[in-house]
Amino acid sequence: MTKKIELAQIQVLFLGIWRFLLHLRQRLVEDQINIRAGHLAYVTLLSLVPMVAVTMSMLSAFPVFKGIRGQIEAFVYENFLPAAGDTVQVYINEFVGNASKGTAVGIAALVVVAIMLISAIDKSLNNIWRTKEKRSVVVAFSMYWMVITLGPVLVGASLVATSYVVSLKLFEGDALSGVMPLFIERLPLFFSVAAFLLLYMVVPNQKVKFWHALLGAVVAALLFELGKKGFALYVTKFPSYEAIYGALATIPILFVWVYLSWMIVLLGAEITAAMPEYLDYESSSDINETNLDGQPLAAQDTPAAQPETTSGQSTQVLETTGELAATAPQSTTLDKP
């Protein structure tokens, strides 16, 4: 009897995961994140030099960060621009040096372009969350300006704190001798989780639960770390771009990596936004009384209910197609509340 109960619980668990994945798949198709990622990649490349220039200017305003500017640059390029990071760093530093010599009007233009990137990110994420209410111009500009000014300071402060912790004699004992290398090795992953968590909780113009955002942040961070290693392996082992483009290979390599990065960011956002929708559906239906086909055990002959559309929100349908017929022959629907 106990084994049957455990088997039923496992069955319900996998059914829930399956339905969530179908719901997520439907969302990904509706939101066309591949097109959004391409748009954000283009805007990112256009805004890359202005963002770096503004960031370095903000760090230069604080004397405490002058000694670690090189460390911050190395950390960012090594962990966020795999493979071609050294070449990109040389070019970007040269471009930033040229941009910093501009006039006040030129610097203001750089700030405007940097704000364009943040605005594009804001609109893309709020579209994923189906947010109706838009921020006022004053609130939006204040938030964008806060990101530009406080973002570099927070990154610099976190690296300073990390350097201080690493230098503490507390970690020099034999018992903890193996802890610090492991901590330093996992540091990029921790930073990625924190960055994605902050992005998914702050940017949407609605309340996002911490655990939902954490799930999306962890998935995105893990995919980001795997993506870095896989992309670096591809570039080094299969140098097709270098064979075709020669000295200009850095440009398409950078664009492809930025595009993949935004795909991962948007996927994490979709997971975070889909969680409350699926949980609301689960709480409104007796999922424990369904079999693996998605039909109620007591009334399997009853036709599946048609989804209802709520004003201002897209209808979420988890419907098995011909591709999924072997696994789930009956259609499964999910009504978004």
Curated annotation (Swiss-Prot):
Chief site of localization: membrane
GO cellular component: plasma membrane
Subcellular location field: Cell inner membrane
Protein's recorded name: UPF0761 membrane protein Shewmr4_0316
Residue stretches spanning the membrane: 4-24, 45-65, 102-122, 137-157, 183-203, 213-233, 247-267
Ranges of compositional bias, category Polar residues: 307-319, 328-337
Family label: Belongs to the UPF0761 family.
Keyword terms: Cell inner membrane, Cell membrane, Membrane, Transmembrane, Transmembrane helix
Short name of one Pfam family: Virul_fac_BrkB
Superkingdom to which the source organism belongs: Bacteria
Residues covered by region (Disordered): 291-337
Topology in the lipid bilayer: Multi-pass membrane protein
